[in-house]
């Protein structure tokens, strides 16, 4: 059964490594050393719920509900455009230190709300956990399925805590004005690219619904 664990771990790691909204947010909180371990835990717990739902049967709901998929997609597009705009505005600020200080004033609950939006309004999360993991893990018998899910969840916990701790450790180098400008530009551009990609997928979904 251990082979199913490592299969799940490898697949989970492959899906979570690319830079996306979750990773960017965890990295930024680590650099600020602002509730970064709490955010890593909440991201990992969110993945636990989504992965479990996808592997143990939730994928059927998304696949059979094209309107739900469209709603999630366009909600994600709107959020990613807003999130990317915020990062680019911070990067282009004439007083980056003041802009960063304003971000640091955010309270715990606002940070948690942003994390939940970054996670649950990202359609790629549902495609990864419900469609990809659901189609692969859902075909297994119950015992291998549990090991497969455990491996995938382990990859998520290891990655988010590792990213948060590494970003906090590198904070003295990454918290400079130049580094912050580069990071925010990178995050903003990536968020907009993902948003435009999702918008194209959303248009295709809407076209399929009305034809």
Swiss-Prot record:
Keyword presence, DNA damage: no
UniProt keyword terms in alphabetical order: Amino-acid transport, Cell inner membrane, Cell membrane, Membrane, Transmembrane, Transmembrane helix, Transport
GO CC annotations, alphabetized: plasma membrane
Chief localisation class: membrane
A Pfam family annotated for this UniProt entry: LysE
Annotated TM spans: 1-21, 37-57, 68-88, 111-131, 147-167, 179-199
NCBIfam families (UniProt xref): 2a75 (TIGR00948), PRK09304.1 (NF006801)
Reaction(s) the record says it catalyses: L-arginine(in) = L-arginine(out)
Matching InterPro entries: Arg_export_ArgO_enterobac, LeuE-type, Lys/arg_exporter
Disulfide linkage: none
GO terms, molecular function: L-arginine transmembrane transporter activity
Transmembrane helix is among the record's keywords: yes
Biological function: Involved in the export of arginine. Important to control the intracellular level of arginine and the correct balance between arginine and lysine.
Subcellular location: Cell inner membrane
Family indicated by similarity: Belongs to the LysE/ArgO transporter (TC 2.A.75) family.
Membrane topology designation: Multi-pass membrane protein
Protein's name according to its UniProt entry: Arginine exporter protein ArgO
Species of provenance: Salmonella enteritidis PT4 (strain P125109)
């Amino acid at each position: 059964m251990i082979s199913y664990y490592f299969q799940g771990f490898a697949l989970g790691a492959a899906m979570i490594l690319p830079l996306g909204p979750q990773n960017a947010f965890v990295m930024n909180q680590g650099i600020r050393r602002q509730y970064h371990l709490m955010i890593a835990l909440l991201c990992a717990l969110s993945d636990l719920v989504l992965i479990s739902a996808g592997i143990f049967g939730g994928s059927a709901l998304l696949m059979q509900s094209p309107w739900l998929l469209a709603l999630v997609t366009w909600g994600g597009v709107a959020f990613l455009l807003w999130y990317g705009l915020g990062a680019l505005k911070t990067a282009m600020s004439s007083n980056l230190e003041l802009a960063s200080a304003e971000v640091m004033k955010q309270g715990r609950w606002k940070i948690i709300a942003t994390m939940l939006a970054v996670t649950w309004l990202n359609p790629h999360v549902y495609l990864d956990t419900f469609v990809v993991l659901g189609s692969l893990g859902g075909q297994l018998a119950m015992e291998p399925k549990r090991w497969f899910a455990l491996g995938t969840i382990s990859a998520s916990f290891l990655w988010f805590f590792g990213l948060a701790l590494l970003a906090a450790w590198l904070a003295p180098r990454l918290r400079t004005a130049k580094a912050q400008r580069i990071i925010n530009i990178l995050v903003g551009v990536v968020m907009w690219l993902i948003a435009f990609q999702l918008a194209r997928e959303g248009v295709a979904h809407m076209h399929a619904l009305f034809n």
